[in-house]
């Protein structure tokens, strides 16, 4: 069992139940899934770029990503309908908790000029999104083999009913929010 999953079930559920004033432990917010997305606009020009992006995302997530394709042709961006323009992966279960553990303990502290996560990135329903400018913050990425610095979007979907419950859940997991 993943370390954070065990920690959530044994300690956080009881703590959050009293902190949020909930009656039933089934009301306690939990993390449903984590979605990682990497947009690769340059893939239209060079197919190798997409391969490098897929390899990076596979190393970070621990599972194979799905290639996202453009929905329609846009002349201004020089892309055609159906061309690969990115990759995404959805993590659930133990892999999700293991990724969350690596994100909180290793990747976020390695971000340059980091001053805390913005508390404004909640969507109104308790879900949180953050963007990372460099994929090299993750220890799985070998710095010498990186062809270019690429960012990625991380969306954390929770069962929280509002932003306050979502913030309390992520803060209990150890997310370093700005004060």
Swiss-Prot record:
**An example Gene Ontology biological process:** translation
Matches recorded under PROSITE patterns: RIBOSOMAL_L5
Q: Name one GO cellular component term.
A: ribosome
Entry's Gene Ontology molecular function annotations:
rRNA binding; structural constituent of ribosome; tRNA binding
**Pfam families, A to Z:** Ribosomal_L5 (PF00281), Ribosomal_L5_C (PF00673)
Could you identify this protein by its name?
A: Large ribosomal subunit protein uL5
| Keywords carried by this UniProt record | Ribonucleoprotein, Ribosomal protein, RNA-binding, rRNA-binding, tRNA-binding
Subunit text: Part of the 50S ribosomal subunit; part of the 5S rRNA/L5/L18/L25 subcomplex. Contacts the 5S rRNA and the P site tRNA. Forms a bridge to the 30S subunit in the 70S ribosome.
Task: Supply the source organism's classification.
Answer: Bacteria, Pseudomonadati, Pseudomonadota, Gammaproteobacteria, Thiotrichales
- Please describe what this protein does: This is one of the proteins that bind and probably mediate the attachment of the 5S RNA into the large ribosomal subunit, where it forms part of the central protuberance. In the 70S ribosome it contacts protein S13 of the 30S subunit (bridge B1b), connecting the 2 subunits; this bridge is implicated in subunit movement. Contacts the P site tRNA; the 5S rRNA and some of its associated proteins might help stabilize positioning of ribosome-bound tRNAs.
The UniProt record lists the keyword Ribonucleoprotein: yes
- Gene3D superfamilies on file: 3.30.1440.10
Family statement drawn from the similarity comment of this UniProt entry: Belongs to the universal ribosomal protein uL5 family.
Organism of this sequence? Francisella tularensis subsp. mediasiatica (strain FSC147)
């Amino acid at each position: 069992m993943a370390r954070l999953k065990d920690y959530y079930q044994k300690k956080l559920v009881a703590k959050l139940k009293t902190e949020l004033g909930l009656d039933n432990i089934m009301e306690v917010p939990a993390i449903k899934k984590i979605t990682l997305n990497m947009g690769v606009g340059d893939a239209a020009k060079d197919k190798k770029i997409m391969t490098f992006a897929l390899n990076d995302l596979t190393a970070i997530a621990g599972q194979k990503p799905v290639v996202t394709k453009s929905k329609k042709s846009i002349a201004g961006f020089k892309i055609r309908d159906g061309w690969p323009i990115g990759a995404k992966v959805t993590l659930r279960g133990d892999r999700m908790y293991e990724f969350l553990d690596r994100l909180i303990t290793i990747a976020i502290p390695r971000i340059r000029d980091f001053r805390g996560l913005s508390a404004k990135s909640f969507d109104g329903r308790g879900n949180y999104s953050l963007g990372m400018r460099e994929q090299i913050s993750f220890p799985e990425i070998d710095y010498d083999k990186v062809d270019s610095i690429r960012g990625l979007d991380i969306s954390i979907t929770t069962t929280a009913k509002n932003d306050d419950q979502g913030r309390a859940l992520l803060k209990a997991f150890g997310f370093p929010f700005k004060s």
